[in-house]
Structure formats: C-alpha cells, structure tokens
Amino acid sequence: MKEYKLENIRNFSIIAHIDHGKSTIADRLLESTSTVEQREMREQLLDSMDLERERGITIKAHPVTMYYNYNGEVYQLNLIDTPGHVDFSYEVSRSLAACEGALLIVDAAQGVQAQSLANVYLALERDLEIIPILNKIDLPAANPEKIRKQIEDYIGLDTTHAIACSAKTGEGISEILEAIINLIPPPTPPQETELKALIFDSHYDPYVGIMVYVRVISGEIKKGDRITFMATKGSAFEVLGVGAFLPEATLIEGSLRAGQVGYFIANLKKVKDVKIGDTVTTVKHPAKVPLDGFKEINPVVFAGIYPIDSSDFDTLKDALSRLQLNDSALTIEQESSHSLGFGFRCGFLGLLHLEIVFERIIREFDLDIIATAPSVIYKVVLKNGKTLLIDNPTAYPDPSIIEHMEEPWVHVNIITPQEYLSSIMNLCLDKRGVCLKTEMLDQHRLVLSYDLPLNEIVSDFNDKLKSVTKGYGSFDYRLGDYRKGAIIKLEILINDEPVDAFSCLVHRDKAEARGRSICEKLVDVIPQQLFKIPIQAAINKKVIARETIRALSKNVTAKCYGGDITRKRKLWEKQKKGKKRMKEFGKVSIPNTAFIEVLKID
C-alpha cells in the first residue's frame, strides 16, 4: 500500500435502488483510477457471483481500495459496496458505520425509490456526508432537474453539489471523484492508541480460512498480534496476515492503521465466530469500550428444504454447510417430515435471502430440492403463562391450552404512481394492512406508509405489488412489534390422513379460502386411484373445505352379454366392497409436483 496520510483517506459507500446503476458507476470509478487494467475490466466487477450479475443486485458487500492523483496529492479512496436489498439492512448499517460519506445514486428517469430511501435514512442517522448522483442522463426520459427537486423536497438533502452523470458513457465520473475528495471528510484522528476495528463483513476462503473485513478506527493491526472480539467476548486469536482490496484481496507488508479499510486472517474456523458489527482489539492493550451499534442477526423467515431424491440428503447437508461458511445469517437445523422424508429447517433474513440460497443450491451443487412454504416466528401464549416461539406448523400446541397467539408486524413504505393508489390500498386491505399516512413525493408519485403482518409480506406481496402497479411500485419494510392475531393451524388430510408438508399457520379470516385453494389444486395434481380419495382442509378436526378425486372406473360387466340384471348387480356389489376395502388399506402416493404446485398458490 502507498504512503499513509490520514487526511488523504476517504471512506465512502454507494446507496442505490436495484437497477439504478450502482455497480456500473463502481466499474467506471475503478477504470478512472486505473485500479483495474482495461484488459481485465468486465461489467459489474465487484459483483463476483453469477447470480448477482444476472439479477443486477449486490448480495455480498465488496470493498475496494483505489488511489487517485488530485492537485499533486495521492488520495486513498476506500469504496465499501453494500447490498441494496431490505433483507440485508443490518449489513448495510454496519458498512455505512465504516464510512464518512456516501454517494446516493438516483436514476434520472425513474427518480427516488423505496429501498434507496430506507438506506439514505440509515446514512443520515450515521451523520454521513451524502452526495446525490443523478445517473442515466443519457436516457431520453431523463429529467435531472425534476429528480433534483424530488431529492430536496422529500429527503431534505441539499442538491447544490448534485452531479449529473452517465455511467454508460463515462460522463461526470471525474466530477464524482473530485466531489469524494472535496466533500467527504477524512477519518477523524483517533483519541486513543489502543486497537479498535469495526467488522463489517467476513468471507470464507478455502485456502486461507476466514477473512475478516475491518475498518480500523484507532490503533493498528499487524501480523503476529493477538486479538479478540469485544462484543462476543470470544477466545484470543493470532493474526496470520493483513491485506487490502486492490481490487482483489491481497496480503500486504506492515499494518492496517487508523482510517484504513482492509482484512486480516487468523486461525478462525467458522464464519459464525465472527459477528458483523463486533469490535476487534488486542489482548495486550485492549480498548476500554467497544464500538456501538452491535446486535445479533436473527433469521426472520423460515422454510424447510428437502431433497427430491432422498439419497441426496448428505449432498444437501454438505451444500448448506458450505453456503453457511459465507453466510452467518443462514441457520440450519435437521428435521424430518412424514411426507417429504429427511431435510432441513432453514432460517433466512427475508424472502430474497431464501430465493438466493435456494437458487445457489440448485446451480452450484446441481441438486433437485423442494422448499416448503415460508413461515415467520409466532408467539404462542399458553394458559399457564408460558410463551412459546414457533416457526413450524408441526410445533403448534394443542389449541385447548393456548391463551392467544401473537404475530410479527412490519412498517412498510410503498412508492407508487398516483393512478395505482386505489389498487394498492385494496391490496394492503386484503393483506390486513393498517394505513398510517399518505404523502406526495412529487406531482405524480405518492409514498404510502402501512403496518402489515410479516406473514403477508413474505408470501407474495412483492409480486402482487408489481402486478397492480405494472412494475412501477417499490417498497421497503422494517420489523415492528408483535400483535395479537387469530392465527390457527390449517391441516390438509388426504384419504383421512393428515399430510404435514401441506399444513400451515394462517389467519382465521383466510383459512377457508386457503384451504379451498389447496384442495382444488391437489385434485388436479394427484393421480386417480381405483378408489375415491377425499381431500379435506380442517381446523382443529373440523372440516372447512373438501374435494374428492373420483375413482377410476373399471367395467366389471363387460363380459355379461345381455342376460339377467341381477348378475350385473352382483358384480357391481362385489366391486363396491373391494373398493371400500382398498380405501381402508390403500396408500395414496403424492407426486413431488403436488408439493411444488401448492407452494405456487397465492
């Protein structure tokens, strides 16, 4: 690394809604600072996963150090790229805590969107210097002045220093680099000499083990130091090496000092040992108080993941363990289902997190898997005063001992064009939402604030919102509190046998509609047998919906040519008795497609 001057360091992040050009601007900055040679350049360089490139999103935070000559001085610019999605908001808040400034990228044609709003508020809470960037000015629909006014009116940011640019053509990129140097302050000189470093991410490398990404606040960290983690009060570890992101992770001689961003490797075995937001200090001269803001990340959404072929169980176990090495928020617990066999109960930060894990298992490990319907954590308050936390219908206790149920609610902000207001209000009403306020964002768009049950969000809220707003609506949410709710267990019985994989916890008002739609779907996907099969939806043993798969009919009187009707009746009676016995002892085989089809039900 080049000469160290604290006043020449700039640590910044990029805040943007999905598809507003964050990764492309990062590419242009890397090009302009010659961090990456032209022949090695490719689109979305910091997005290392194929999934990130395809979806146009950032899943893991990717830091990079750039050097830029300006007015005869060399400046060290540390970009800490952050995930943009609401599922990863804690990671975003820790990445922002490692910075002094942020670039707010807004599409000059689309304007401010919900997820960029959420992250701007996180940056404002940290008192960061925010530079608005109006991207995509090369588009015919771009209206930078209108978007500038939108940022001033709704977010309350001064847009005097806003920069209009086009990441596609490279226009305005040098102005962005100059603004980073002139407007974002350097790190504050440390008041203490003891090591304090903020962990903002970690990564498992098969060759060197766990790489811990840090921003050094005070002191320095170097090879040979014995360090410990303050919030989790873990064991002591020896630092085996320190490095920087140039842009690839590269080991360096010397140390990481106050204000710098880099990583260290130690003899750490699991990512779970490293908590994002924790403070690193030395054993010899420990810091007195840790950095504030640390909290444990707990999963919010749960789902069962099962292999379609039961012989793939060990491969699935290995796949999940490997994913967990790089994803400390993913929780795994072995479980078994009467219908699906052995699998895993997994916890996720949100629906996008679930989708990403599901997709990575299929792609990277070539496995065929089934995921059960996503569920949230409910509180069950029992009559004896105890409280249970359940995320699985199989853990639902006997209804006679339940005092009441509580479900998690979230605060939701929806940004939409005005003409879709009534459609969104109907959608939120259908999802049991409570309207808090409606504000104008500009002449054409509104911000709606709602309280909604989390269970309604994790099912299909995003798809329905995109559908009713023709793709123009966006939303973000943050966890609120628990509230009483009439949550009940809906059981599905096939041939009078309950099938646990189809059971779910639903609100009483929606139970009948949900039960009916599952029964109707199963009638279409379960093949006919020689006996009729009843499919029932039941609550507490009371059937609320029923469909019947008709028996395959076999013509037992085909050999009777004319003749006496009593002969035919005797054969029909014998057939009826046989079918009755088959119904008692016959097993209904449920195809895998049935489980997948039920998951598709809204």
Swiss-Prot record:
| A matching Pfam family | EFG_C
Q: List the disulfide bonds.
A: none
Identify the residues that the record assigns to the tr-type G domain, covering every copy: 7-188
Q: Which InterPro entries match?
A: EF-4, EFG_III/V, EFG_V-like, EFTu-like_2, LepA_C_sf, LepA_CTD, LepA_IV, P-loop_NTPase
Q: Name one GO molecular function term.
A: GTP binding
The EC number of this protein is: 3.6.5.n1
Q: Where in the cell is it found?
A: Cell inner membrane
Keywords, A to Z, come to: Cell inner membrane, Cell membrane, GTP-binding, Hydrolase, Membrane, Nucleotide-binding, Protein biosynthesis
Reaction it catalyzes: GTP + H2O = GDP + phosphate + H(+)
Q: Does the keyword Cell membrane apply?
A: yes
| GO terms for cellular component | plasma membrane
Report if keyword DNA repair is assigned: no
Question: Which residues hold GTP?
Answer: D19, H20, G21, K22, S23, T24, N135, K136, I137, D138
Q: Name one GO biological process term.
A: positive regulation of translation
Topology of the protein relative to the lipid bilayer? Peripheral membrane protein
What the record says about family reads: Belongs to the TRAFAC class translation factor GTPase superfamily. Classic translation factor GTPase family. LepA subfamily.
Against PANTHER family, the record matches this protein to: TRANSLATION FACTOR GUF1 HOMOLOG, CHLOROPLASTIC, TRANSLATION FACTOR GUF1-RELATED
**What role does it play?**
Required for accurate and efficient protein synthesis under certain stress conditions. May act as a fidelity factor of the translation reaction, by catalyzing a one-codon backward translocation of tRNAs on improperly translocated ribosomes. Back-translocation proceeds from a post-translocation (POST) complex to a pre-translocation (PRE) complex, thus giving elongation factor G a second chance to translocate the tRNAs correctly. Binds to ribosomes in a GTP-dependent manner.
Full protein name:
Elongation factor 4
Q: Source taxonomy lineage? A: Bacteria, Pseudomonadati, Chlamydiota, Chlamydiia, Chlamydiales
- Chain's gene name: lepA
